[in-house]
């Protein structure tokens, strides 16, 4: 009697690339649902409907609806903090550093597209997970800015001055997002004066007399009128 070996039937084992693709699909669906409904309107049912996946598939990767949202918020923080860190390593000239920091902030916001609206709507809501991520990002940015001031041999800004500058940037970027239709780029006629407002405020809160004197020679910051 000959021995017969039968192959195991069933679905083939998922590759790492396939698993990452499904995970990314869930995270993208979470972003879409969050954009429409905010964190309070986030549910597994809506995420799997958006992703076109079965519920067991979702739970193979995430335990609840908040977990993929945390992935999104972590990426958002890394993008903002990393962008500002890169901006502050690109120059040793104080005024240019301030401008680069602002442009990093604006670039981060533009990269979020329509998701920026619910993100900003929940920044100051203690019940939202977005709020905790905001605090972490701000603390990382404070640390990065202080380290750059020390590296340049400049007096470290007071906590109030630094927070005033960062909160102003945050607010202006929010205003830009509120004035921009979902999925569209900010109107250049709105973006240019908003960027200029941030530059002027950073100069006066974090800069020195020498910085202001230098900036006064730049007519695009302070027109000669």
Model-derived segments and spans:
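Amphipathic alpha-helical segments used for helix-helix packing
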Residues: 109-128, 146, 174-181
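Short, hydrophobic secondary-structure boundary micro-motifs
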Residues: 43, 117-120, 131, 185, ...
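Alpha-helical DNA-contacting segments of helix-turn-helix folds
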Residues: 34, 62, 66-76, 119, ...
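Hydrophobic alpha-helical connector segments
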Residues: 71, 85-111, 165, 192-195
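Basic, helix-initiating cap at the start of DNA-binding domains
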Residues: 1-37, 41-50, 67-70
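Short hydrophobic/aromatic patch on the recognition helix
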Residues: 52-62
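C-terminal peripheral helix-coil segments that are non-catalytic and often amphipathic
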Residues: 1-9, 107, 143-150, 175-225
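Amphipathic alpha-helical packing segments from all-alpha helical-bundle domains
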Residues: 78-82, 108, 128-153, 159-175, ...
């Amino acid at each position: 009697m000959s021995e017969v070996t039968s192959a195991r039937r069933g679905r083939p084992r998922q590759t790492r690339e396939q698993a990452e693709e499904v995970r990314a699909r869930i995270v993208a669906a979470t972003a879409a649902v969050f954009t429409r409904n905010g964190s309070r309107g986030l549910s597994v049912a809506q995420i799997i409907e958006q992703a076109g996946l079965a519920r067991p598939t979702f739970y193979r990767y995430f335990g609840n609806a908040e977990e993929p949202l945390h992935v999104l918020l972590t990426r958002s923080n890394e993008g903002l903090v990393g962008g500002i860190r890169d901006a502050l390593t690109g120059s040793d000239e104080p005024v240019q550093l301030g401008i680069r920091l602002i442009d990093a902030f604006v670039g981060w916001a533009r990269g979020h597209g329509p998701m920026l609206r619910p993100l900003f709507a929940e920044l100051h809501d203690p019940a939202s997970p977005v709020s905790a991520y905001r605090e972490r990002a701000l603390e990382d940015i404070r640390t990065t800015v202080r380290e750059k001031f020390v590296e340049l041999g400049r007096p470290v800004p007071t906590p109030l001055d630094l927070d005033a500058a960062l909160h102003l940037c945050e607010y202006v970027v929010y205003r830009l997002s509120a004035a921009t239709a979902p999925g569209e780029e900010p109107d250049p006629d709105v973006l240019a004066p908003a960027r200029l407002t941030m530059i002027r405020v950073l100069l006066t809160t974090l800069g020195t007399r020498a910085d202001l004197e230098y900036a006064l020679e730049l007519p695009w910051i302070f027109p000669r009128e």
